[in-house]
Amino acid sequence: MATDQTVLRHIKELADEEHRLYERGKLTDEEKARLKAINVALDQYWDLLRQRRAKREFGQNPDEAEIRSPGIVEKYEN
């Protein structure tokens, strides 16, 4: 079961990895693919955190929040 703290910790780990990749400058194809995967995962975890906070705000159980598929969270940006 994820808590807000574990979600935030995972977001920080992903963001740190993202920054390390950007600092390298020119990326290999594998690193570019990893960067894209990190960005999708970050979107998913930020969405999960928003869901948890919204459920809590409206008196629902935040533990019922679930990670949504990339197809769903990526559509928010479009």
PLM regions: where:
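Extended, charge-rich alpha-helical interface modules
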Residues: 1-78
